[in-house]
Protein backbone atom coordinates (compact mmCIF):
# COMPACT_ATOMS: atom_id res chain seq x y z
CA UNK A 1 0.00 0.00 0.00
CA UNK A 2 1.28 3.45 -0.89
CA UNK A 3 1.18 6.42 1.43
CA UNK A 4 2.31 10.02 1.34
CA UNK A 5 4.62 11.16 4.12
CA UNK A 6 4.95 14.85 4.89
CA UNK A 7 7.46 16.54 7.17
CA UNK A 8 5.99 19.88 8.15
CA UNK A 9 7.66 23.23 8.45
CA UNK A 10 8.79 24.15 4.95
CA UNK A 11 7.72 27.37 3.25
CA UNK A 12 6.53 26.94 -0.34
CA UNK A 13 8.00 29.15 -3.06
CA UNK A 14 8.14 29.10 -6.85
CA UNK A 15 5.55 28.36 -9.51
CA UNK A 16 3.27 25.44 -10.30
CA UNK A 17 1.34 24.83 -13.52
CA UNK A 18 -2.29 23.76 -13.39
CA UNK A 19 -3.62 20.83 -15.40
CA UNK A 20 -6.92 20.48 -17.21
CA UNK A 21 -9.99 20.38 -15.00
CA UNK A 22 -11.16 16.95 -13.87
CA UNK A 23 -14.73 18.17 -13.54
CA UNK A 24 -14.65 19.57 -17.08
CA UNK A 25 -12.92 16.76 -18.94
CA UNK A 26 -15.20 13.90 -17.85
CA UNK A 27 -18.43 15.28 -19.39
CA UNK A 28 -16.53 16.49 -22.46
CA UNK A 29 -15.19 12.96 -23.04
CA UNK A 30 -18.74 11.64 -22.62
CA UNK A 31 -20.00 14.23 -25.12
CA UNK A 32 -17.74 12.82 -27.84
CA UNK A 33 -20.29 9.98 -28.09
CA UNK A 34 -22.66 12.48 -29.72
CA UNK A 35 -20.45 12.89 -32.80
CA UNK A 36 -21.49 10.59 -35.64
CA UNK A 37 -18.77 12.02 -37.91
CA UNK A 38 -15.03 12.50 -37.42
CA UNK A 39 -12.57 12.06 -34.55
CA UNK A 40 -12.63 14.27 -31.45
CA UNK A 41 -9.28 15.56 -30.20
CA UNK A 42 -9.19 16.77 -26.59
CA UNK A 43 -6.11 18.59 -25.31
CA UNK A 44 -4.90 19.59 -21.84
CA UNK A 45 -6.37 16.38 -20.42
CA UNK A 46 -5.13 15.56 -16.88
CA UNK A 47 -3.52 12.19 -16.16
CA UNK A 48 -6.04 10.99 -13.55
CA UNK A 49 -7.57 7.64 -12.67
CA UNK A 50 -11.06 9.05 -13.34
CA UNK A 51 -10.03 9.89 -16.92
CA UNK A 52 -8.83 6.33 -17.46
CA UNK A 53 -12.13 5.06 -16.03
CA UNK A 54 -14.35 7.07 -18.37
CA UNK A 55 -12.11 6.15 -21.30
CA UNK A 56 -12.70 2.49 -20.42
CA UNK A 57 -16.46 3.13 -20.32
CA UNK A 58 -16.34 4.61 -23.84
CA UNK A 59 -14.27 1.70 -25.13
CA UNK A 60 -16.86 -0.70 -23.72
CA UNK A 61 -19.53 1.29 -25.58
CA UNK A 62 -17.58 0.59 -28.80
CA UNK A 63 -15.85 3.95 -29.24
CA UNK A 64 -12.22 4.03 -30.35
CA UNK A 65 -10.27 5.86 -27.61
CA UNK A 66 -6.60 6.71 -27.13
CA UNK A 67 -4.87 8.71 -24.39
CA UNK A 68 -1.30 9.85 -25.09
CA UNK A 69 0.46 12.51 -22.97
CA UNK A 70 -2.27 15.10 -22.35
CA UNK A 71 -4.36 14.32 -25.43
CA UNK A 72 -7.42 12.09 -25.75
CA UNK A 73 -8.81 11.15 -29.16
CA UNK A 74 -12.24 9.55 -29.57
CA UNK A 75 -13.87 8.16 -32.68
CA UNK A 76 -17.49 7.22 -32.02
CA UNK A 77 -18.63 6.90 -35.63
CA UNK A 78 -19.27 3.16 -35.39
CA UNK A 79 -22.27 1.42 -33.88
CA UNK A 80 -22.38 2.58 -30.27
CA UNK A 81 -23.78 0.20 -27.66
CA UNK A 82 -25.93 1.60 -24.87
CA UNK A 83 -25.02 -0.48 -21.81
CA UNK A 84 -22.53 0.95 -19.26
CA UNK A 85 -21.88 -1.86 -16.75
CA UNK A 86 -21.38 -1.74 -13.00
CA UNK A 87 -17.72 -2.80 -13.13
CA UNK A 88 -16.83 0.64 -14.56
CA UNK A 89 -19.53 2.92 -13.20
CA UNK A 90 -18.99 1.76 -9.59
CA UNK A 91 -15.54 3.39 -9.65
CA UNK A 92 -16.81 6.85 -10.49
CA UNK A 93 -20.25 8.37 -10.21
CA UNK A 94 -19.49 10.85 -13.03
CA UNK A 95 -19.87 7.87 -15.39
CA UNK A 96 -23.58 8.63 -15.37
CA UNK A 97 -22.90 11.54 -17.76
CA UNK A 98 -22.73 9.02 -20.61
CA UNK A 99 -26.48 8.55 -20.19
CA UNK A 100 -27.55 11.76 -21.93
CA UNK A 101 -25.28 11.22 -24.95
CA UNK A 102 -26.31 7.55 -25.25
CA UNK A 103 -30.00 8.38 -25.10
CA UNK A 104 -29.61 11.09 -27.73
CA UNK A 105 -27.38 9.05 -30.03
CA UNK A 106 -28.90 5.55 -29.77
CA UNK A 107 -32.38 6.06 -28.31
CA UNK A 108 -31.58 3.98 -25.25
CA UNK A 109 -29.24 3.89 -22.27
CA UNK A 110 -28.66 1.32 -19.56
CA UNK A 111 -26.27 2.61 -16.92
CA UNK A 112 -25.44 1.12 -13.52
CA UNK A 113 -26.27 3.28 -10.52
CA UNK A 114 -23.06 5.23 -9.86
CA UNK A 115 -20.22 4.94 -7.33
CA UNK A 116 -17.32 7.32 -6.59
CA UNK A 117 -16.63 9.18 -3.33
CA UNK A 118 -19.13 8.33 -0.59
CA UNK A 119 -20.33 11.89 -0.03
CA UNK A 120 -24.00 11.71 0.86
CA UNK A 121 -26.72 10.31 -1.37
CA UNK A 122 -26.26 12.62 -4.38
CA UNK A 123 -29.40 11.23 -6.08
CA UNK A 124 -29.80 11.01 -9.85
CA UNK A 125 -33.50 11.87 -9.89
CA UNK A 126 -32.89 15.30 -11.44
CA UNK A 127 -31.16 13.69 -14.42
CA UNK A 128 -34.06 11.28 -14.93
CA UNK A 129 -36.69 13.99 -14.56
CA UNK A 130 -35.11 15.84 -17.48
CA UNK A 131 -34.99 12.75 -19.68
CA UNK A 132 -38.65 12.00 -18.92
CA UNK A 133 -39.64 15.57 -19.80
CA UNK A 134 -38.09 15.02 -23.24
CA UNK A 135 -40.13 11.86 -23.78
CA UNK A 136 -37.92 9.09 -22.42
CA UNK A 137 -39.33 6.16 -20.48
CA UNK A 138 -37.15 5.60 -17.42
CA UNK A 139 -37.08 2.73 -14.95
CA UNK A 140 -34.65 1.52 -12.29
CA UNK A 141 -34.24 -2.24 -11.96
CA UNK A 142 -31.60 -4.49 -10.44
CA UNK A 143 -29.18 -1.63 -9.81
CA UNK A 144 -29.42 -0.22 -13.32
CA UNK A 145 -31.10 2.87 -14.77
CA UNK A 146 -32.76 2.10 -18.08
CA UNK A 147 -34.01 4.86 -20.38
CA UNK A 148 -35.53 4.51 -23.84
CA UNK A 149 -36.97 7.00 -26.30
CA UNK A 150 -38.15 6.55 -29.88
CA UNK A 151 -37.22 10.20 -30.21
CA UNK A 152 -36.35 12.94 -27.77
CA UNK A 153 -38.47 16.08 -28.00
CA UNK A 154 -37.50 19.50 -26.68
CA UNK A 155 -39.09 20.40 -23.35
CA UNK A 156 -39.03 22.87 -20.49
CA UNK A 157 -37.17 21.47 -17.49
CA UNK A 158 -36.87 23.08 -14.06
CA UNK A 159 -34.16 21.71 -11.76
CA UNK A 160 -35.12 21.74 -8.08
CA UNK A 161 -31.41 22.15 -7.33
CA UNK A 162 -28.71 23.46 -9.72
CA UNK A 163 -27.04 20.06 -10.07
CA UNK A 164 -23.90 20.08 -12.21
CA UNK A 165 -24.33 16.50 -13.41
CA UNK A 166 -28.02 16.90 -14.22
CA UNK A 167 -27.37 20.12 -16.11
CA UNK A 168 -24.68 18.43 -18.19
CA UNK A 169 -26.67 15.27 -18.86
CA UNK A 170 -29.88 17.03 -19.90
CA UNK A 171 -27.95 19.57 -21.99
CA UNK A 172 -26.19 16.80 -23.92
CA UNK A 173 -29.39 14.82 -24.46
CA UNK A 174 -31.13 17.95 -25.76
CA UNK A 175 -28.53 18.66 -28.46
CA UNK A 176 -30.03 16.01 -30.76
CA UNK A 177 -33.65 16.36 -29.59
CA UNK A 178 -36.38 17.60 -31.89
CA UNK A 179 -37.17 21.23 -31.11
CA UNK A 180 -36.11 23.51 -28.27
CA UNK A 181 -35.23 22.55 -24.70
CA UNK A 182 -35.14 25.15 -21.93
CA UNK A 183 -33.48 24.18 -18.64
CA UNK A 184 -34.11 26.52 -15.70
CA UNK A 185 -32.21 26.85 -12.40
CA UNK A 186 -29.17 25.20 -13.99
CA UNK A 187 -25.66 24.91 -12.59
CA UNK A 188 -23.46 27.84 -13.61
CA UNK A 189 -19.99 26.37 -13.01
CA UNK A 190 -17.15 27.12 -15.47
CA UNK A 191 -17.19 23.41 -16.35
CA UNK A 192 -20.76 23.84 -17.68
CA UNK A 193 -19.55 26.65 -19.93
CA UNK A 194 -16.64 24.53 -21.14
CA UNK A 195 -18.98 21.68 -22.07
CA UNK A 196 -21.35 24.06 -23.88
CA UNK A 197 -18.43 25.51 -25.84
CA UNK A 198 -17.38 22.00 -26.89
CA UNK A 199 -20.92 21.08 -27.93
CA UNK A 200 -21.25 24.28 -29.97
CA UNK A 201 -17.93 23.58 -31.69
CA UNK A 202 -19.46 20.23 -32.70
CA UNK A 203 -22.43 22.01 -34.26
CA UNK A 204 -24.86 22.16 -31.35
CA UNK A 205 -26.89 25.25 -30.53
CA UNK A 206 -26.51 25.87 -26.81
CA UNK A 207 -27.22 29.35 -25.47
CA UNK A 208 -26.97 30.69 -21.91
CA UNK A 209 -24.35 28.45 -20.28
CA UNK A 210 -23.04 30.28 -17.23
CA UNK A 211 -26.46 31.83 -16.53
CA UNK A 212 -29.48 30.40 -14.70
CA UNK A 213 -31.27 29.37 -17.92
CA UNK A 214 -29.85 27.31 -20.79
CA UNK A 215 -31.65 27.00 -24.12
CA UNK A 216 -30.78 24.24 -26.58
CA UNK A 217 -32.02 24.14 -30.17
CA UNK A 218 -31.84 20.52 -31.30
CA UNK A 219 -29.88 19.63 -34.45
CA UNK A 220 -29.86 16.49 -36.61
CA UNK A 221 -26.21 15.51 -36.10
CA UNK A 222 -22.95 16.59 -34.50
CA UNK A 223 -19.44 16.41 -35.92
CA UNK A 224 -16.26 15.71 -33.94
CA UNK A 225 -13.96 18.65 -33.24
CA UNK A 226 -10.83 19.72 -31.34
CA UNK A 227 -11.03 21.26 -27.89
CA UNK A 228 -8.69 22.27 -25.05
CA UNK A 229 -9.94 21.62 -21.50
CA UNK A 230 -10.04 24.60 -19.11
CA UNK A 231 -7.54 24.71 -16.19
CA UNK A 232 -8.59 23.01 -12.96
CA UNK A 233 -9.89 25.64 -10.53
CA UNK A 234 -9.99 23.17 -7.63
CA UNK A 235 -6.36 22.17 -8.13
CA UNK A 236 -5.55 25.90 -8.31
CA UNK A 237 -7.44 26.58 -5.09
CA UNK A 238 -5.67 23.72 -3.34
CA UNK A 239 -2.23 25.12 -4.20
CA UNK A 240 -3.35 28.64 -3.27
CA UNK A 241 -4.12 27.39 0.23
CA UNK A 242 -0.81 25.49 0.36
CA UNK A 243 1.04 28.73 -0.37
CA UNK A 244 -1.01 30.73 2.13
CA UNK A 245 -0.67 28.38 5.11
CA UNK A 246 3.10 28.00 4.71
CA UNK A 247 3.68 31.75 4.44
CA UNK A 248 5.00 31.17 0.95
CA UNK A 249 5.09 33.02 -2.36
CA UNK A 250 3.75 30.88 -5.20
CA UNK A 251 2.59 31.62 -8.73
CA UNK A 252 -0.31 29.35 -9.72
CA UNK A 253 0.18 29.22 -13.49
CA UNK A 254 -2.89 29.15 -15.74
CA UNK A 255 -5.29 29.69 -12.82
CA UNK A 256 -8.32 31.73 -13.94
CA UNK A 257 -9.34 34.33 -11.30
CA UNK A 258 -12.95 34.50 -12.51
CA UNK A 259 -13.35 30.78 -11.86
CA UNK A 260 -12.41 31.04 -8.16
CA UNK A 261 -13.50 34.55 -7.20
CA UNK A 262 -15.26 33.35 -4.02
CA UNK A 263 -12.09 31.66 -2.77
CA UNK A 264 -9.98 34.70 -3.61
CA UNK A 265 -12.39 36.92 -1.65
CA UNK A 266 -12.21 34.70 1.44
CA UNK A 267 -8.42 34.38 1.35
CA UNK A 268 -8.03 38.15 1.03
CA UNK A 269 -10.41 38.56 3.98
CA UNK A 270 -8.04 36.32 5.97
CA UNK A 271 -5.05 38.51 5.15
CA UNK A 272 -3.61 36.54 2.23
CA UNK A 273 -2.15 38.65 -0.57
CA UNK A 274 -3.52 37.69 -4.00
CA UNK A 275 -2.00 39.20 -7.14
CA UNK A 276 -3.48 38.55 -10.57
CA UNK A 277 -0.66 38.20 -13.08
CA UNK A 278 -0.68 37.72 -16.84
CA UNK A 279 -0.13 33.96 -16.65
CA UNK A 280 -1.85 33.11 -13.38
CA UNK A 281 -2.41 34.04 -9.74
CA UNK A 282 0.34 34.81 -7.23
CA UNK A 283 -0.36 33.96 -3.59
CA UNK A 284 1.69 35.40 -0.72
CA UNK A 285 0.96 34.03 2.74
CA UNK A 286 0.75 36.38 5.76
CA UNK A 287 2.39 36.09 9.17
CA UNK A 288 -1.03 35.75 10.81
CA UNK A 289 -4.36 34.55 9.44
CA UNK A 290 -7.71 36.05 10.42
CA UNK A 291 -10.67 33.76 11.13
CA UNK A 292 -13.55 33.86 8.63
CA UNK A 293 -16.82 31.98 8.25
CA UNK A 294 -17.47 30.10 5.02
CA UNK A 295 -20.63 28.58 3.55
CA UNK A 296 -20.45 26.30 0.51
CA UNK A 297 -22.91 27.15 -2.24
CA UNK A 298 -23.51 26.34 -5.90
CA UNK A 299 -21.35 28.45 -8.24
CA UNK A 300 -20.63 31.37 -8.08
CA UNK A 301 -20.70 30.67 -4.35
CA UNK A 302 -17.88 28.99 -2.45
CA UNK A 303 -17.22 25.55 -4.01
CA UNK A 304 -17.96 22.47 -1.94
CA UNK A 305 -14.89 20.85 -3.52
CA UNK A 306 -12.74 23.40 -1.61
CA UNK A 307 -14.46 22.84 1.73
CA UNK A 308 -11.98 20.46 3.37
CA UNK A 309 -8.92 22.36 2.10
CA UNK A 310 -10.41 25.62 3.39
CA UNK A 311 -10.89 24.06 6.81
CA UNK A 312 -7.11 23.62 7.04
CA UNK A 313 -6.49 27.35 6.73
CA UNK A 314 -9.43 28.08 9.05
CA UNK A 315 -7.92 25.94 11.82
CA UNK A 316 -4.65 27.88 11.51
CA UNK A 317 -6.42 31.23 11.85
CA UNK A 318 -6.67 33.28 15.03
CA UNK A 319 -10.12 32.98 16.58
CA UNK A 320 -13.24 30.95 15.89
CA UNK A 321 -14.48 30.24 12.39
CA UNK A 322 -17.42 28.26 11.02
CA UNK A 323 -17.60 26.08 7.92
CA UNK A 324 -21.16 25.38 6.76
CA UNK A 325 -21.85 22.77 4.07
CA UNK A 326 -25.05 23.30 2.08
CA UNK A 327 -24.38 21.28 -1.08
CA UNK A 328 -23.73 17.72 0.18
CA UNK A 329 -24.61 15.99 3.41
CA UNK A 330 -22.04 13.74 5.09
CA UNK A 331 -19.05 15.73 3.82
CA UNK A 332 -17.35 16.12 7.20
CA UNK A 333 -15.84 12.63 7.42
CA UNK A 334 -12.34 14.16 7.36
CA UNK A 335 -12.95 16.07 10.60
CA UNK A 336 -12.09 13.03 12.75
CA UNK A 337 -8.81 12.63 10.85
CA UNK A 338 -7.96 16.30 11.36
CA UNK A 339 -8.68 15.92 15.08
CA UNK A 340 -6.02 13.21 15.14
CA UNK A 341 -3.62 15.99 14.14
CA UNK A 342 -4.74 18.14 17.11
CA UNK A 343 -7.29 20.28 15.26
CA UNK A 344 -9.95 21.82 17.52
CA UNK A 345 -13.17 21.12 15.60
CA UNK A 346 -16.75 20.39 16.59
CA UNK A 347 -19.50 19.27 14.21
CA UNK A 348 -22.89 20.91 14.78
CA UNK A 349 -25.45 19.84 12.19
CA UNK A 350 -24.35 21.07 8.78
CA UNK A 351 -21.54 23.17 10.26
CA UNK A 352 -18.13 22.69 11.85
CA UNK A 353 -16.99 25.08 14.58
CA UNK A 354 -13.23 25.56 14.29
CA UNK A 355 -11.08 27.14 17.02
CA UNK A 356 -7.63 28.37 16.13
CA UNK A 357 -4.83 28.73 15.73
CA UNK A 358 -4.23 25.00 16.14
CA UNK A 359 -0.77 23.62 16.87
CA UNK A 360 -0.97 20.69 14.49
CA UNK A 361 0.86 17.46 15.23
CA UNK A 362 1.87 14.90 12.63
CA UNK A 363 -0.16 11.67 12.70
CA UNK A 364 -1.16 8.73 10.56
CA UNK A 365 -4.44 9.64 8.88
CA UNK A 366 -6.65 8.10 6.21
CA UNK A 367 -8.19 10.01 3.32
CA UNK A 368 -11.99 9.70 3.27
CA UNK A 369 -12.58 11.21 -0.16
CA UNK A 370 -10.75 13.00 -2.97
CA UNK A 371 -10.57 16.52 -1.55
CA UNK A 372 -10.03 15.31 2.02
CA UNK A 373 -6.92 13.51 0.77
CA UNK A 374 -5.47 16.80 -0.45
CA UNK A 375 -6.56 18.61 2.73
CA UNK A 376 -4.77 16.13 5.01
CA UNK A 377 -1.57 16.57 3.00
CA UNK A 378 -1.96 20.35 3.32
CA UNK A 379 -2.34 19.96 7.08
CA UNK A 380 0.85 17.90 7.09
CA UNK A 381 2.75 20.80 5.49
CA UNK A 382 2.29 22.86 8.66
CA UNK A 383 2.18 20.12 11.30
CA UNK A 384 4.98 19.44 13.74
CA UNK A 385 6.68 16.17 12.82
CA UNK A 386 5.60 13.59 10.27
CA UNK A 387 2.16 13.07 8.76
CA UNK A 388 1.36 9.81 6.98
CA UNK A 389 -1.63 9.90 4.62
CA UNK A 390 -3.12 6.61 3.41
CA UNK A 391 -5.95 5.69 0.99
CA UNK A 392 -4.28 7.49 -1.92
CA UNK A 393 -6.76 5.96 -4.38
CA UNK A 394 -8.92 8.98 -3.61
CA UNK A 395 -6.13 11.48 -4.27
CA UNK A 396 -5.33 9.92 -7.65
CA UNK A 397 -8.89 10.50 -8.82
CA UNK A 398 -8.36 14.26 -8.92
CA UNK A 399 -4.68 15.22 -8.56
CA UNK A 400 -1.81 14.19 -10.82
CA UNK A 401 1.64 14.07 -9.21
CA UNK A 402 0.44 16.12 -6.24
CA UNK A 403 3.46 15.22 -4.10
CA UNK A 404 5.86 15.99 -6.96
CA UNK A 405 4.41 19.46 -7.46
CA UNK A 406 4.68 20.17 -3.74
CA UNK A 407 8.29 18.93 -3.75
CA UNK A 408 9.12 21.34 -6.57
CA UNK A 409 7.83 24.19 -4.39
CA UNK A 410 10.10 23.14 -1.52
CA UNK A 411 7.91 20.85 0.57
CA UNK A 412 9.30 17.79 2.35
CA UNK A 413 6.90 15.19 0.95
CA UNK A 414 7.42 11.68 -0.39
CA UNK A 415 5.14 9.03 -1.86
CA UNK A 416 6.31 5.63 -0.73
CA UNK A 417 5.43 1.95 -0.65
CA UNK A 418 4.42 1.20 2.92
CA UNK A 419 6.18 -2.18 2.89
CA UNK A 420 9.53 -0.67 1.90
CA UNK A 421 10.00 2.00 4.56
CA UNK A 422 11.11 2.02 8.17
CA UNK A 423 8.32 3.87 9.98
CA UNK A 424 10.61 4.28 13.00
CA UNK A 425 13.05 6.32 10.92
CA UNK A 426 11.00 8.57 8.64
CA UNK A 427 13.73 11.22 8.74
CA UNK A 428 15.76 9.02 6.39
CA UNK A 429 13.29 9.83 3.61
CA UNK A 430 14.26 13.50 3.52
From Swiss-Prot:
Subcellular localization: Cytoplasm
For this chain, the family text in UniProt reads: Belongs to the EPSP synthase family. MurA subfamily.
**What name appears for this protein in its UniProt entry?**
UDP-N-acetylglucosamine 1-carboxyvinyltransferase 1
**Coiled coil start-end:** none
Classification via PANTHER family:
UDP-N-ACETYLGLUCOSAMINE 1-CARBOXYVINYLTRANSFERASE (PTHR43783:SF1)
Chain positions with 2-(S-cysteinyl)pyruvic acid O-phosphothioketal modification: 117
Q: What class of enzyme is it?
A: transferase
Enumerate the catalysed reactions. Answer: phosphoenolpyruvate + UDP-N-acetyl-alpha-D-glucosamine = UDP-N-acetyl-3-O-(1-carboxyvinyl)-alpha-D-glucosamine + phosphate
Q: Which UniProt keywords apply?
A: Cell cycle, Cell division, Cell shape, Cell wall biogenesis/degradation, Cytoplasm, Peptidoglycan synthesis, Pyruvate, Transferase
Q: Pfam families, from UniProt?
A: EPSP_synthase (PF00275)
A Gene Ontology cellular-component term:
cytoplasm
Q: Taxonomy-wise, where does this protein's organism fall, top ranks first?
A: Bacteria, Bacillati, Bacillota, Bacilli, Bacillales
Cytoplasm: present as a keyword of the record? yes
